[in-house]
Amino acid sequence: SKSDFRAVKVKECVAVPKSKKLLQFTLDDGTGTDRTILSGIHAYYEPEELVGKTLIAITNFPPRKMMGIDSCGMLLSAVNNLKDSEDEELHLLMVDNHIPAGAKLY
């Protein structure tokens, strides 16, 4: 089955206790039921700067437990390898806030 890409709005984002990397997102995916996705991107973003953003998620992955929390999907990001360095930078894919939650990407 094909991946289902949807616009999602970040309602809440918090650092997962006892985890250096994980952020827990509470997302509006247009269904009327909040969706939880965990993402190991705390090195790149502080949770509060992501609230209110419109992101892209793959929403038809089976739930996966991380630190005891069900993560229901995956957020899309772009990774750039920094020149002359082992480091990479990660950017969550953010889209125009006019795009409604749940809009399907083709």
Predicted stretch roles:
Residues 1-106:
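Phosphate-backbone binding interfaces of nucleic-acid-interacting proteins
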